[in-house]
């Protein structure tokens, strides 16, 4: 009988452990709409804005693969009231009539893995809105404060990084670029925080020089 009880106990522990997915930090990634439309084979149906808007909030790991499509702990669907704000800060750049599909995909693939910091679907989107608006992690505004405007000029990597550092407790961001012809455009900027989502950290895993998304030291168009 004791052996049966022990077996049941171990089985419960294994089930609980297998349903808990670990992560080390969050990536809060924003994409520059104009560059996304310029560098992608998929045509944007709507004219892009000269703004960085949300791509996603992703639980990530320092080592090994990032978690994806995790079991959902608590079900609380996204409130319609939030969608008015999401339409502004988190549009589907390629087709704004498909915003809901984009949000659903980001929640299912990434947000579902943020437990316990992210408690449910509604909390995931509330957290992103808070980070972008209340916590002033709007990359466009951070750059603008440093007099770096989206005027199509070519910038030095260090100038962009330093501007972002000034708005992120001097922590290093992750930049993604895309080369089109002879022009390299700034496509995404990622801010990283600890697993609580409360404190900035240096972003690990920068793109290597052999990557098509590597940002050179100079002549980055923004």
Curated annotation (Swiss-Prot):
Q: Which UniProt keywords apply?
A: Disulfide bond, Endonuclease, Glycoprotein, Hydrolase, Lyase, Nuclease, Signal
- Briefly state the protein's biological role: Self-incompatibility (SI) is the inherited ability of a flowering plant to prevent self-fertilization by discriminating between self and non-self pollen during pollination. In many species, self-incompatibility is controlled by the single, multiallelic locus S.
- Primary enzyme class: lyase
Q: How does it get modified after it is made?
A: N-linked core structure at Asn-138 contains xylose.
Q: Which residues pair up as cystines?
A: 37-44, 70-113, 177-215, 192-203
Q: What family is it from?
A: Belongs to the RNase T2 family.
The record's catalysed reaction(s) read: a ribonucleotidyl-ribonucleotide-RNA + H2O = a 3'-end 3'-phospho-ribonucleotide-RNA + a 5'-end dephospho-ribonucleoside-RNA + H(+)
The positions making up the signal sequence are: 1-22
Q: What residues form the catalytic site here? A: 55, 106, 109-110
Q: Which PANTHER family match?
A: RIBONUCLEASE 3, RIBONUCLEASE T2
The EC number(s) this enzyme carries = 4.6.1.19
Q: Which residues are glycosylated?
A: 40, 138
Residues that bind RNA: 31, 55, 92-93, 102, 105-106, 109-110
Record organism? Pyrus pyrifolia
Pfam families for the chain: Ribonuclease_T2
Give GO MF terms, alphabetically. Answer: ribonuclease T2 activity; RNA binding
Protein name per Swiss-Prot or TrEMBL:
Ribonuclease S-3
Looking at the UniProt record for this protein, which Gene Ontology cellular component terms does it annotate, in alphabetical order?
extracellular region
User: Among its keywords, does the record have Lipid metabolism?
Assistant: no
- CDD domains, per database record: RNase_T2_euk
Please, one GO biological process term? RNA catabolic process
Q: Which domain of life is it from?
A: Eukaryota
The record's annotation in PROSITE patterns points to:
RNASE_T2_1
